[in-house]
Amino acid sequence: MRVFIRPGFIVTPEEIIENKGIYADITNGRIVSISDYYEKADVEIVLPKNTIAFPGFINAHDHLLGSYWPRVGEGPHITWKTWDDALKASPLYKERSKIPNFYLYLLGAYKNLISGVTTVMDHIPHKVNDNFINKLPIRVIKNYTLAHEVSKYDLKWGDGVDVEHKRAVENDFPFVTHIEEGFDEESLKGIDYLKQYGALTEHTVMVHGLGLSDEDLDDIAKAKAHLVTCPVSNYFMFKTIARLKEWFARDINVSLGTDSPMSGSINILEEIKFLKMAYKSKYGEDIDDRTILFMITKNPAKAFRINKDFGYIKPGYIADITIVKFKGDIYSSIVNAWFNDIEMVIMGGKVVYAFSEYEEIFKKFYSQGNFSKVILDRKERLIIGDLNTIMKQVYGFLGFKKELPFIPIELEY
């Protein structure tokens, strides 16, 4: 089946293309061409002219098991460990535990999907998420090795930093770890520990990095390693954000993640808005909107070594596309976007989320029952799977109707 998608603008993300469409092949899920309408397609999706097609957003850091709300354990803390202790001692943590893990994963997946995210990095041991990720409505990166953190506070995820990093290099996977998430003496040793293990390389993806010194950043840049920032979580826990201007000055590859909603943002759209505001507050100047787009598309694709398939709208790439309403200008549209500015989400050339007026298009992709109508943020939507039933089951596990702002659903219970 061949699909033709015609938005007002296409952002590749490095180039802006007008008055063209995207041909995609459902058989392999890939983009065939960006061109005029030159041959009949099985499905034609003609979008309003005030829409922009971006590569499907990539959330570079989440913990899907922590898909709950509200935030717990506000700082300032000196290290993540005191926040984690506060979380696990809280009544909310006990409340969350009533929900089976698979349903927490479903909540996290739908949280990401309705904000335009098509791929997420779920930082957790494989034994936790392996049984879930193929059953979710979004892509979860499968090929990675990991540590929890590189310090004495490490929760002992994986088989040890040296073993996990070696495995990453041998398989051309990313090695993912938290780094220097805090300011005490032990937290600040993270890069030194990585160097001792020989684990600071182009395969290394480090999250948070609040305590990174200039020397650390020089070492990271020299190694061509990657950094991920989660400013909402960082500010909630530590009342500061990472030294992003210093990261950018060294041409380090930087991506954006949400962390879990129990310390971080409710979705990538909130994360973008807070990043814009916090950067201006810290440095007295704006972070470029194009840079932010790169932080949720091509940069994480490079970091997680999936940039031959994801992160771009180009022929041969997987047809994961997020359609956003035009607001202000091309790049500021993602900064200004909220729930109802996500016009449509496409994965592998198939529509997985859209406004209800696209129902006839949905029916061409799915038999009845494989998608559902939902009211999200006061608008009727179509979405893959049965989100209404999932939410009712979650309420059943809890024994009450829980308001979760990352899924603003209207539902009788």
Label each residue range with its predicted role.
Residues 203-213, 228-236:
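Catalytic beta/alpha-barrel core
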Residues 1-40, 81, 91-119, 124-125, ...:
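Active-site microenvironment of metallo-dependent hydrolases
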Residues 144-149, 231-236, 259-262:
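Short, acidic/turn-prone active-site loops that include or flank metal/cofactor-
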Residues 8, 22, 29, 50, ...:
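Divalent metal-coordination and catalytic microenvironments
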Residues 197-200, 245-326, 336-348:
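His/Asp/Glu-enriched, well-ordered alpha-helical/loop segment
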